[in-house]
Amino acid sequence: MGLLAYLLVILLILNVFFAAVTVFLERRDTSATWAWLLVLTFVPIFGFIIYLIFGRKLSGKKIFDWKGQEKIGIQESTANQIEMIRQKEFPFSDPNVKKHRDLIYLLLVNDGAILTQDNEVELFVDGHEKFDALIADIEKAKDHIHLIYYIFHSDELGNRLMRVLERKAAEGLNVKIIYDAMGSRTTKKSFFRTFQKNGGLVRPFFPSKLPLINFRLNYRNHRKLAIIDGDVGYIGGFNIGDEYLGASKKFGYWRDTHLRVHGKAVYAMQTRFIMDWNSASSTHKIDYKARYFPTFHGKGHTSMQIVSSGPDSEWQQIKNGYIKMINAAKKTIYLQSPYFIPDASLLEAIKIAALSGVDVRVMIPNKPDHAFVYRATTNYAGELMETGAKIFIYDNGFIHAKTLVVDGEIASVGTANMDFRSFRLNFEVNAFIYEKQMVQKLEDAFLEDILKSYQLTPELYAKRSLWIKFKEAVSRLLSPIL
């Protein structure tokens, strides 16, 4: 037996060993375990390399480091709210908010997501309007600007925003940017050079520590937050790039959902940014200071919670919030997501609602952002139709919104898609909203989108080719690790 054969045997033994590690040592969902076993078994050696890059869980040390930075300045307020709601003494602003105290309590206990009731919220469904408003707020900034985006492209929109940030940094403002190392992988470091020379600070999230190899590649910071002077915050689905203004020939018009918030909910966005910055940066750590949490004299009436989730937690807070909302539905469930790949618990919750007579409507894109993932989406949509749920295909460009509206009373908007990746692997952030007027605006936007969609009927779905059916089956089988 030659040297090459010996090496091959060793690699195959290692492959079997890591397959065993996947099954017996790492705590993970059963469906994900079986998906990785398939990869390791049927793609030996290369499957092992893929597993090293995409399959390993964050170590206990990394998780501990994250948790050591959590809840800056809000621990006492969280504990007080939990106790007041438990004792039924919390001063809810209106009956609709009080009606959903169980959901509020769940998110408080799971994530420390404080309920704030004095927020003014503006809804954006168009990228031009969102970025015009964001840049106008940045232009008016007096003290600091904090941005975190999964994608920050160096194209026309990226340069337009960067010129403003460079100028504000040169004026002496505290300006910090976090971008995801994977999401913004095509953006060169030189793009930020003038910004940094002017005093701005920028950090990639989970960058590669080795050339061409990043063992944390699978854990992405998918959050999109902007905080200006601790006074105004933005949260939603728009990244920074020309395609989000509808400039992509592939996608055309880009339909997304974003919120501008003025009120105490901005405190939670600020806290989230501080935690992410202190994890991404080994220097220039941010301490809790009053400048980052100014006194509000709110005139708004929107009650909301800012909820974060990620692989640093075992609870999947946003998904649990979705399930609680769906279980509470009596009349309608309106759901939008570019990727609809629910795990068993979420899928069962939606099915039960549909079978109980709730009007369930799910909206997905008419074209793939990621072709392989899209086939899993259509497969799950087809299964859901069997329960009486209605599936709508958005046909006016690309739908990227991550929105859930229930009974016209509660809603969630943010960065989390309805898929395994958002619930288990990505760092996400969503707003959970309890004010009927704001929820009605989100419901109206959904119904307007239906006018630009066509319904996927069982008859239409049955006409897909054998090749499409095969791709759906394979994509669904591997969906827990996509």
Swiss-Prot record:
It comes from the Bacteria. The chain crosses the membrane at residues 4-24, 34-54. One of its GO terms (biological process) is cardiolipin biosynthetic process. Its EC number is 2.7.8.-. The keyword Transferase applies. Disulfide bonds: none annotated. GO terms for cellular component: plasma membrane. It is a multi-pass membrane protein. Keywords: Cell membrane, Lipid biosynthesis, Lipid metabolism, Membrane, Phospholipid biosynthesis, Phospholipid metabolism, Repeat, Transferase, Transmembrane, Transmembrane helix. The active site is at residues 222, 224, 229, 400, 402, 407. It is an enzyme of class 2 (transferase). GO terms for molecular function: cardiolipin synthase activity. It is found in: Cell membrane. It catalyses: 2 a 1,2-diacyl-sn-glycero-3-phospho-(1'-sn-glycerol) = a cardiolipin + glycerol. Residues 217-244, 395-422 form the PLD phosphodiesterase domain. The keyword Ligase does not apply. PANTHER family: CARDIOLIPIN SYNTHASE (PTHR21248), PHOSPHOLIPASE D (PTHR21248:SF22). Belongs to the phospholipase D family. Cardiolipin synthase subfamily. Catalyzes the reversible phosphatidyl group transfer from one phosphatidylglycerol molecule to another to form cardiolipin (CL) (diphosphatidylglycerol) and glycerol. This is Cardiolipin synthase. The gene is cls.
